[in-house]
């Protein structure tokens, strides 16, 4: 009788262990399937973002070639590393044909010469050059001459995105500044231009 009870106890214990292992392996397989689904979803989302970013890049490159673009700045960087976050609709560098506009407007109580808190200068663009390096990054440069401006403007746009930096370097002083933001074709831009000098 003792042997039968001992044998029965061993069988029940062994069956319980097997069931626990089966439950663990089923749980492990479910977790692995969930992990694979999340990984596939993340890869699809990244591919969609990359496709959208590349489309914006191609659009921006064509706008540079057509000389019909606007760089809407989200941030303005000054000479010694200080910077300010700004409103993209009122801070921009644009070009349409051979005419260029540079506008800087801060959010404050002072209206400035352009009526919106800063300065707007128009000028004629010359010495326009566009280059693509071996990695596909774009550089675009021009000289802007006008009533209130005489400066060189250099754009840098990395491959695969329409994020761009335009550095404005005045010819008569060293107070350069950089506009950092997104570059769009003029018809897709939503900027407000103040009074120019």
For each of these PLM feature ranges, what is it?
Residues 55-56, 73-89:
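N-terminal post-signal-peptidase region of extra-cytosolic proteins
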Residues 63, 94, 101, 156-158:
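Well-ordered beta-strand positions
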Residues 1-26:
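Bacterial Sec-dependent N-terminal signal peptides
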Residues 18-63, 70:
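Sec-dependent signal peptide cleavage junction
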Residues 83-137:
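Mid-length scaffold segments of soluble, non-membrane domains
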Residues 64-66, 71-73, 88, 95:
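Extended beta-sheet lipid-handling architectures
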Residues 74-76, 96-98, 105-107, 145, ...:
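Solvent-exposed coil/turn segments that connect beta secondary-structure elements
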Residues 25-28, 127-197:
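Helix-rich interaction surfaces within compact, conserved domain-sized segments
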């Amino acid at each position: 009788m003792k042997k039968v009870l001992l044998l029965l106890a061993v069988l029940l214990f062994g069956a319980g262990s097997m069931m626990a292992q089966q439950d663990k392996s089923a749980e492990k397989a479910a977790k692995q399937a969930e992990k694979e689904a999340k990984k596939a979803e993340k890869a699809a989302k990244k591919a969609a973002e990359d496709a959208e970013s590349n489309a914006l890049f191609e659009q921006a490159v064509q706008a540079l070639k057509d000389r019909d673009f606007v760089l809407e700045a989200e941030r303005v960087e000054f000479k010694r590393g200080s910077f300010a976050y700004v409103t993209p609709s009122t801070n921009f560098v644009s070009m349409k044909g051979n005419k260029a506009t540079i506008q800087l407007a801060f959010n404050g109580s002072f209206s400035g010469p352009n009526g919106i808190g800063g300065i707007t200068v128009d000028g004629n663009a010359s010495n326009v050059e566009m280059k693509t390096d071996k990695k596909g990054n774009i550089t675009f440069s021009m000289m802007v001459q006008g009533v209130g401006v005489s400066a060189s403007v250099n754009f840098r746009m990395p491959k695969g995105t329409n994020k761009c930096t335009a550095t404005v370097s005045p010819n008569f002083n060293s107070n350069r500044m950089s506009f950092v933001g997104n570059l769009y074709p003029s018809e897709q831009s939503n900027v407000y231009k103040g009074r120019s000098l």
